[in-house]
Amino acid sequence: MSDVRVIIQRDSEREEHVVTTGTTAGELFPGQRTVVAARIGGELKDLSYELRDGESVEPVEISSEDGLNILRHSTAHVMAQAVQELFPEAKLGIGPPVKDGFYYDFDVEKPFTPEDLKAIEKKMQEIQKRGQKFSRRVVSDEAAREELADEPYKLELIGIKGSASSDDGADVEVGGGELTIYDNLDPKTGDLCWKDLCRGPHLPTTRFIPAFKLMRNAAAYWRGSEKNPMLQRIYGTAWPTKDELKAHLEFLEEAAKRDHRKLGNELDLFSFPDEIGPGLAVFHPKGGVIRRAMEDYSRRRHEEEGYEFVYSPHATKGKLFEKSGHLDWYADGMYPPMQLDDGVDYYLKPMNCPMHNLIFDARGRSYRELPLRLFEFGTVYRYEKSGVVHGLTRSRGFTQDDAHIYCTKEQMAEELDRTLTFVLNLLRDYGLTDFYLELSTKDPEKYVGSDETWEEATETLRQVAEKQGLPLVPDPGGAAFYGPKISVQCKDAIGRTWQMSTVQLDFNLPERFDLEYTGPDGSKQRPVMIHRALFGSIERFFAVLLEHYAGAFPVWLAPVQAVGIPIGDAHIPYLQEFAAKARKQGLRVDVDASSDRMQKKIRNQQKNKVPFMIIAGDEDMANGAVSFRYRDGSQENGIPVDEAIAKIAKAVEDRVQV
């Protein structure tokens, strides 16, 4: 046996080892059960991979991003084996890892029931305890077709070997240049227990799966296309330890309590009537109050910052979107055309920017007018498949707080800095404080403009982002074809990350629309264009805030800021006078004049998450005072009426949480 020299790479440390031919990657890390795979030459490999001379080996820990994906992918295989042991007629689809878990699609006659999921999970536990070995083997196309002749969906995947997409998860099975099958082998006899078409890598054995749980099942089209058969998808989650699984399940329980769709119904804020269709919300009076408060504050802050408000129609001739390029790049996300005016195609607008460009171009512009900051609460419409529509966060019709800034090249850095500072400060005003920034840079395969322009713009964005003193995460190749961007990522009250605002440079539209301004020397020059969406959309931001606050909005956003609770019916007129006086100062105050007992009224308003309850009885009436009850159940008594109203007004003015 000859010697093989390899390098073990751990972060910045490099160790050279001499091993014999046939040594596997796993043998470099004996007893280290947290190591589940290896990265060799930039590619993930099983620990059973035989090392070659000169290779660099980086251990992959189970708790790393790659390690978690491998854990979850292997668990998906165990689930598929369990399903086929219990339901032999089930045909296999695709089973990739996803964020915090995995899924697998199956073609079965009947949808899985909750009892089925329990049985599948029990069978998975049996398979896990068997310690089956995951064993990789390379097969020819012909051999794969022969082995998987009874799996029609696998046969289809074999036909797209090497060109599979990550969008539908097919790349986890046939994304490489060769076909491989993973066998699950009995650890004692080596007999085949189950097999699947898969790229891998996988865990060494099923005993490396410490903690998992099946979550739910749902219908899903094969490879995400409505033209394909409907399959049954089972979702699960897997973690390196039982404690991490427990923490994740507790997190999901809390997230479910905060689900904006649930809270929207409980608090009577909005709904999605079947008569209107998926992804199209109607806001009820209380939801309308919150939305108006959000918009009014944003409008005032934009006016203070020098933005000019514009309005544009909801539909336009198709020629506009041909000019902008949307029909070339975004046609799949647009609604079909309406033929009007003797066959002219009209479209519902998916974006506001083309119309803002027409406003800029409506007359000659001078450098003295720049920067020109146009702002609109513009409603747009995007065709989303019903399977991806999700409450207010992914909808078909929504209103963007959309700004487009036109400036000179010399003004670009200052304007980007000013815009990002404004964005972050405004988000903080709504109670979001935990941010990091993401810088999306050029995709070398898809971009317009010169390399020099991109490099200069990207460096300017980088400097602007770094000035904020926030973590800056690179997103190489993540920019749209027309320019680099900064995204503001925000963590909510339970640690989930939401993409909020974007600040995007555009080298494409000013050229397409031939936008010009007159420079100081009288020459025609091209403006720099900046896209900026602060909330993303009003609806989505509404949902984020609703979940962030769990429905208990700060006083200034609460639909009802205070409710009068009379101790008895005789105290109702007194509280109604209090409410009328407060409303004259712009406060949202109601009185619960129902026939319910006082304690039930208090419980009802606690469920409604009202910031203040104003309680009054005989002594309060005699003294011209009220009692304040807070959300946490604490109470202040004997507060004079004017002082009580001023207290509510102060909480609104300071935008505080109570």
Swiss-Prot record:
Residues 1-61 form the TGS domain. It is an enzyme of class 6 (ligase). The keyword Magnesium does not apply. Pfam families: HGTP_anticodon, tRNA-synt_2b, tRNA_SAD. Zn(2+) binds at C353, H404, H531. Coiled coil: none annotated. Its EC number is 6.1.1.3. The keyword Disulfide bond does not apply. Catalyzes the attachment of threonine to tRNA(Thr) in a two-step reaction: L-threonine is first activated by ATP to form Thr-AMP and then transferred to the acceptor end of tRNA(Thr). Also edits incorrectly charged L-seryl-tRNA(Thr). Belongs to the class-II aminoacyl-tRNA synthetase family. HAMAP family: Thr_tRNA_synth. This is Threonine--tRNA ligase. It comes from Streptomyces griseus subsp. griseus (strain JCM 4626 / CBS 651.72 / NBRC 13350 / KCC S-0626 / ISP 5235). The lineage of its organism: Bacteria, Bacillati, Actinomycetota, Actinomycetes, Kitasatosporales.
